[in-house]
Amino acid sequence: MASHFFSAFSCLYSYFVLDVTNQAGINKGITTWEQVNLINEHIRTYLENKGMKILDIYVCPHRIEESCQCRKPQPGLLLKASKEHDINLAESIIVGDQDMDIEAGKNAGLKKVIKI
């Protein structure tokens, strides 16, 4: 899978890449912020070693029943990233493997969505 990922997304290497992730395990008590941050830093390092730079990582720790605005498919984290990094979402692309990823992009005003 990893080799297909890198060949498929090599065209994104010149773009700003943000990682927006739901991690309800934090609020469920299954994992900790420290563990999630360690995993995210491992992913960041791995991807950077492959030539893909991750500009920032955004994590929602909430469970579905908490009804927050940051858990995908809500657009909260995408809007926050847009504001913090001065990103025009209408000119951005969201790539995700879940319907909620694509819905979050659409809810944030992205016109280009790719489901893998």
Regions found by a protein language model. Name each.
Residues 94-116:
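Acidic, Mg2+-coordinating phosphoryl-transfer loop and its flanking beta/alpha structural elements
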Residues 43-48, 82:
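Conserved hydrophobic residues forming the short capping helix/wall of the S-adenosyl-L-methionine
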Residues 1-8:
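Basic, amphipathic juxtamembrane/active-site segments
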Residues 69-99:
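Conserved Lys-Pro-Asp/Glu-containing loop-to-beta segment of HAD-superfamily phosphomonoesterases
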Residues 9-40, 52-66, 105:
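Substrate-recognition element of Asp-dependent hydrolases with the DxDx(T/V) motif
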Residues 47-53, 86:
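Short helix-capping segments at alpha-helix termini
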